[in-house]
Amino acid sequence: MHPKRKQRLILVLFVVLVSSVGVSLTLYALNENINLFYPPTKIVNGEAPSGRTIRAGGCVVPGTVTRAKDNLEIDFDVTDGVSELSVTYDGILPDLFAEGEAVVLTGMLDHDGVFVATKVLAKHDENYMPPEVADTVTTDGVEHMKTCKGISYDS
C-alpha cells in the first residue's frame, strides 16, 4: 500500500473511531437523563419502569391529601380519570397545589406501587394543564376539558 494512502486510511479510521465514541457517550448520557412521562393508568398497569426516575401527572383526587404533623411528608392520589396512583412527597409543595388540580410529578415508583415524588409541579393559571396531562386525562376514551374539571374521581 502506498504510504500516502496508508496515512489517509489511518486518518479516516481514527476519525470514525473518535466519532463513534462521541456518539456512544452522547447517547448514553441522554439515555440516563431522559425522564419519560407516564399517566397513572400505565403506572398502575405496570407499564412504567420500577426503580427508575420517571414523570407522572394527572389531577389530585379531592379528599386524598394527608399531611404529616411532624414533618413535610404529604400523601395524595393522582388520577387520569381511569386509574388512581398513590403518591408520597417529602418537601414543600408549590403554592398552586390543590385538590382537583393538575400536577406533574418527577420521581420513582417503589416496590409497593407508591410513586415517591422528588419534584411536584402545579398548574400556573386557571385554564392551564400540562400537555402531557391533558393528553392522558380521559374517561371512557372521551377527552375532558384541558383542566381537571369534569373528571369523575370515583375509580
From Swiss-Prot:
> What is this protein called in UniProt?
Cytochrome c-type biogenesis protein CcmE
Family matches, as SUPFAM superfamilies: Heme chaperone CcmE
Entry-linked Pfam families: CcmE
UniProt GO BP: cytochrome complex assembly
Supply the source organism for this entry. Teredinibacter turnerae (strain ATCC 39867 / T7901)
Which InterPro entries would you find in this protein's record? CcmE (IPR004329), CcmE-like_sf (IPR036127), NA-bd_OB-fold (IPR012340)
Domain of life of the native organism: Bacteria
Broad class of the protein's primary localization:
membrane
